Structures are given as structure tokens and as C-alpha cells.
Amino acid sequence: MTRFDPFFQTALDDLDRRHLKRVLSPVDRDGPVIVRRDGASLLDFSSNDYLGLSHHPALRARAIDWTERFGIGSGASRLVTGTSEQYRQVEARLARFKGTEAALLLASGWQANAAVLPALLRISAAQTGEPALVFTDRLNHASLHHGCQAAGVRQIRFAHNDLGHLEHLLAQRQAQRGLRFIVTESVFSMDGDRADVAGLRTLADRYGAFLYLDEAHATGVLGPQGRGLSAEAGGVDLAMGTFSKALGGFGAYVAGSRAVCDWLVSTCSGFIYTTALPPGVLGVIDAALDLVPTLDAERAHLAGLADRMRAGAGALGWSTGPSSTQIVPVIVGAADRALTLARALAARGMLGTAIRPPTVPAGSARIRVALSAAHDETMVDRLLSALEDAAREHGIAP
């Protein structure tokens, strides 16, 4: 115990009173969509394992093979110990997958956004003497906001997915000398809606802006062969994504021009000062890149499940917001109602996590349903039935 513990405990008690305290729940995984908790098996509707690859035998085999052949750890930063042939191979494959000149692997999605953006935005002051003008969607992921804050720039926030508002803001600042950056997501992780990437590309070209697109929840799921929404729009200036969701593994990437990636190698603190990913993790990424382009049937199945979930929830009176992807929020409102509903779902064998402020705006707490190609229609119907029963039992009206 430290002398500061009473301060922390008082703050924790306050979070608890407001139904905002977060706790870790021990679980064991039994395949991509089954977890065991407190002796019970639950159908998992909370994981981002969108293609069900986290337990795929090809990924397991490649992880074992590369670990046995190349070792367990990488030892240090790539700038200290060098870049392995496995790294070169995976980055080259990733660049081909994304249709870019180059790609760079990083440790996690959070680290990528938090570290890449400050390095990227620094180019404005270096080349123009003025800070970057950064236009960001109001509902961007916390890591994107953190990266902009770490860069010391003031974000110019546009209304969510409102390209008219974005163009108005861009036009207002045409006379300013700083380089322009548009920073947004292709799929928004809490609402499950999509950005108009083609429209963003048009505005970026019209106003001479650099388009940075977070594809964490689109990579593997959307676009031709799962290459993301940027592939439908003719590309963006820099695409970021993760391997920890649809690709079933761990790590993150950015993909863009050779000049941009080379700049990041020299200036991105999260790349320079981080130990490189282990060979086994690189093996998982390599195997996933073999599989993902071939999984059109799984992507179609996943889209059908999402349509079924939205229709079923709507028939029960629940709002699923603007969702058009595999992420389907069941919007409950108050945080305590979301927690009660999540516990009641668990009692019925369903794992649906309550998402509360500050992750989502106050008054929009929800059960975030994340669907997987490993689910089937019967599982979705069971979730809808459990949702109806749980809400009725606890008097939680849509």
C-alpha cells in the first residue's frame, strides 16, 4: 500500500457509483466464438475476430514454424539489430495487398496512431514553418485524438461523417500556410458505420490535403479481397490498420508511399524505440495474408449475419444507429441499464459487452455486438431471443 492509495480508492469508488468502473473478467477461449467464464460457456459477441481466424490451423502452424526456425523474440528495435528477412517479406506482401509502394509494421493499433501522427504532422512545421492544419472526425478513435494531441496541434473537428461541414472548414482555411491533413476512420468501431472514403479522397485532392485513414475495422472485411475501403476509393495517402481483428493475430501497419514510410522510420518514436514484433507473430500475419484474399464467401456470410442482427434488433424496438457493417450497437442509453442488460445476457449464455462513457457519448451506452464469420444464423437468433427475454425481465424498454 502507498500513501496515495486512498486518493485512488476514492476516485475508484466515484467511478463505481456512476457505473463507469472497469474490471477485468477472467475467461478461457474455446475457439473463435466460445468463451468459458465462471464455469459457464458463453457465445462471444464482443470479439473483433471478424473472420474467425484467431484459431485457424494455418495461422497456428505458421506461428509454430517461424518460432522454431527464427526464435521467440526479436531482441531490440529494428534500427538497433537490423531488419530480418521475415520482416522484409511481410512488409512487401502487405504493400502489395494494400496496393501501395511500401508498408511498415508496428506493435499495435493504438501505438500506430499515437506515434505515427506526431511524426507525420511534424512535416508541416519543418517545411512551411507553420503547424499542420488537422481536420478530424468528431467520433474518431481515442488513439487518433491522442496522436494529434501528442503532436501539439489543435484539431479542427468536423461533424461525424459530414463532408459538407468538412469542406466548409477546409475552404475557410485556404489562405493558411500549414499543410492540411484529414484524419478519420473507414469503419467506426462503436457505431459500425462507414466513412465516404471516395468523397474524402475528392476533398483531399480539391484542397491539397493529406488523407490519413484508420482501417482497423475494415481490413480483411471490406473492400475487394478484404483490402479495406481505401481500395474502393483509389487509395489514400496513408492507410493504417491492424492484424489483431479480422486477421486473427497481433500488430498494426501503415501503408503508403516509400517517402512517407522512410520518413516514419527516421522520425516515428513508436517505431524507433520499440522492440520489433516476434517471429511467431510475423508468421501469423504472413499466413493471414495468404488466406484473407480468398475469403469472399466468409465476408458475404458475415454481412448477412449483420443484416439479420440489425433487422432482428429493430423488430424488437432497439436502435442500432447508423451501423452498416459487422459492428451492430444495441443502443440502451444509461450506463447502468447497459450493465444490467450485459449481465442478464451473460446469464443466458451470451457475452455482449456494455460500452459506456467516455468510450461513447453520455446517454448512448450500448451492447456492442461484434459479429464473426464463425457465427451462424442460429447463434444470432439465440442472441436476439436472449436480448428480448433479458430486457423484459429487467424492465429495460428500447
Swiss-Prot record:
Substrate binds at residues 22, 29, 141, 359. PROSITE patterns: AA_TRANSFER_CLASS_2. The keyword Ribosomal protein does not apply. GO terms for molecular function: 8-amino-7-oxononanoate synthase activity; pyridoxal phosphate binding. One of its GO terms (biological process) is biotin biosynthetic process. Its cofactor is pyridoxal 5'-phosphate. Pathway: Cofactor biosynthesis; biotin biosynthesis. The keyword Magnesium does not apply. The modification N6-(pyridoxal phosphate)lysine is found at residue 245. Pfam families: Aminotran_1_2. Pyridoxal 5'-phosphate binds at residues 109-110, 189, 214-217, 242-245. Its EC number is 2.3.1.47. Keywords: Acyltransferase, Biotin biosynthesis, Pyridoxal phosphate, Transferase. It catalyses: 6-carboxyhexanoyl-[ACP] + L-alanine + H(+) = (8S)-8-amino-7-oxononanoate + holo-[ACP] + CO2. Catalyzes the decarboxylative condensation of pimeloyl-[acyl-carrier protein] and L-alanine to produce 8-amino-7-oxononanoate (AON), [acyl-carrier protein], and carbon dioxide. Belongs to the class-II pyridoxal-phosphate-dependent aminotransferase family. BioF subfamily. Homodimer. This is 8-amino-7-oxononanoate synthase. It comes from Gluconacetobacter diazotrophicus (strain ATCC 49037 / DSM 5601 / CCUG 37298 / CIP 103539 / LMG 7603 / PAl5).
